[in-house]
Swiss-Prot record:
Stated name of the protein: Trypsin inhibitor B
Note, other: Electrophoresis identifies three genetically distinct variants, A, B, and C, that are inherited as codominant alleles.
Short name of one Pfam family: Kunitz_legume
One Gene Ontology MF term: serine-type endopeptidase inhibitor activity
Key words, A-Z: Disulfide bond, Protease inhibitor, Serine protease inhibitor
Keyword Disulfide bond attached: yes
Length: 181
């Protein structure tokens, strides 16, 4: 089945979407500096429910018009404002291992990035188009895929995206209206 946005339209291959939580208490997905990072290299969920986050380009290497559940995907932030020091950082998402919070979703150049891809899977069969993000390692059978969930930083409450054994982050997709930016 095609992955549908919050208006019921299939996601376009290469389209730009806000990735929003199904729980309105939190905002969308964006990049932020965590730990001792000087640039926003960590993919996080905004704690401001009015913040839709950064538009994310969702693309599949397959020559298809629309994204279907289970397609291998690349996720990449559309351009966003950063301080001069951080201009030019690659914005494609990757999963980096050996971090205190576990395998975490990052952007930028990461020599510890795991070879793999993301995919989108539906979480419920109701009228709400609720999905989860999944990360699969390159050699993956299905059991080598992990749901993308949230790890909450005990120091400052930052909500980092991580490959999780616990509850997946349930999301919806909202098409970025380029005209309104």
């Amino acid at each position: 089945d095609f992955v549908l946005d919050n208006e019921g339209n299939p996601l376009s291959n290469g389209g730009t979407y806000y990735i929003l939580s199904d729980i309105t208490a939190f905002g969308g997905i964006r990049a932020a500096p965590t730990g001792n990072e000087r640039c926003p290299l960590t993919v996080v969920q905004s704690r401001n429910e009015l913040d839709k986050g950064i538009g994310t380009i969702i693309s599949s290497p397959f020559r298809i018009r629309f994204i279907a559940e289970g397609n291998p995907l690349r996720l990449k932030f559309d351009s966003f404002a950063v301080i001069m020091l951080c201009v030019g950082i690659p914005t494609e998402w990757s999963v980096v291992e050996d971090l205190p919070e576990g395998p975490a979703v990052k952007i930028g150049e990461n020599k510890d990035a795991v070879d793999g891809w993301f995919r989108i899977e539906r979480v419920s069969d109701d009228e709400f188009n609720n999905y989860k993000l999944v990360f699969c390692t390159q050699q993956a059978e299905d059991d080598k895929c992990g749901d993308i969930g949230i790890s909450i930083d005990h120091d400052d409450g930052t909500r980092r995206l991580v490959v999780s054994k616990n509850k997946p982050l349930v999301v919806q997709f909202q098409k970025v209206d380029k005209e309104s930016l």
